[in-house]
């Protein structure tokens, strides 16, 4: 009998009150059809632009930011929409919190009087809907493979650059699945020793097809929009399939 794990990984969704949530229906329908053993959302489920440090509140852009609870209510709406179309409460589901969820922690850190209040709203959004969570930078292990929003280097910073998967593979001692850069990549690095190799999969993002966030519109992007289906056994990622958001929309929209 096959004893591996079939896992659907949803990349950075960057939910916002200003972006259509239709993609959560399509993803939910796909998950309902394929019935995986686990569902992982790799973090940055919500953008939390209300807490952005890049637009100061005194600036024109800052004055137009939504309230924190507007972002929270949008996040909760997207979670409920996804779960509605998954329509299967038996599948374990987990979120590895990302740097955009970390905005909530950073904001609270600067205002001691509200310590715990905003984090509770964030955590309850997931926990009350049966999504477990792990902290930013922490690994969630399934079948010997580590899942995290983005691995952190020796300086506590995210691995980055054009070939960050190669850098991660150089330092990793087990297979890793992550997101953050919005680019789907699958890198297998040979190793000396019993494990023989490590495999690093970057799952891209789960934004609408061809949607680029405002902060990156003039950047070098090469983003990948979709979800990833993984097969894990013998402590390795053995299968990796990228399903584009365009295909999901055509099939389930």
Where are these predicted regions, by residue range?
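N-terminal active-site segment of His-dependent metallophosphoesterases
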Residues: 1-80
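Hydrophobic/aromatic residues located in beta-strands of well-ordered beta-sheets
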Residues: 39, 93-95, 200
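Conserved beta-sheet core of the metallophosphoesterase superfamily
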Residues: 145-243
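Active-site metal-binding loops of divalent metal-dependent hydrolases
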Residues: 11-15, 43-47, 99-101, 150-152, ...
């Amino acid at each position: 009998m096959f004893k591996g794990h079939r896992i659907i990984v949803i990349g950075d969704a960057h939910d916002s009150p200003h972006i259509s949530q239709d993609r959560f229906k399509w993803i939910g329908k796909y998950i309902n059809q394929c019935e995986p053993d686990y569902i992982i959302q790799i973090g940055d489920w919500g953008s939390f632009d209300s807490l952005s440090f890049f637009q100061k509140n005194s600036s024109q852009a800052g004055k137009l930011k939504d309230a924190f609870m507007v972002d929270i209510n949008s996040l909760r709406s997207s979670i409920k929409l996804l779960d509605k179309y998954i329509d299967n409460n038996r599948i374990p589901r987990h979120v590895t919190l990302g740097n955009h969820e970390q905005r909530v922690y950073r904001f609270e850190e600067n205002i001691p009087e509200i310590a715990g209040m905003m984090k509770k709203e964030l955590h309850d959004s997931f926990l009350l809907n049966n999504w477990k969570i792990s902290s930013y930078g922490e690994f969630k292990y399934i079948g010997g493979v580590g899942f995290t929003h983005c691995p952190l280097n020796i300086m506590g910073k995210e691995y980055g650059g054009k070939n960050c998967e190669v850098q991660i593979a150089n330092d990793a001692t087990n297979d890793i699945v992550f997101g953050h850069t919005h680019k789907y990549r699958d890198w297998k690095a040979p190793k000396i020793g019993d494990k023989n190799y490590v495999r690093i999969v970057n799952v891209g993002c789960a934004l609408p097809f061809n949607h680029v966030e405002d902060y990156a519109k003039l950047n070098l992007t090469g983003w990948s929009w979709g979800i990833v289906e993984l097969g894990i056994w013998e402590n390795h990622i053995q299968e990796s399939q990228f399903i584009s958001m365009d295909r999901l929309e055509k099939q389930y929209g």
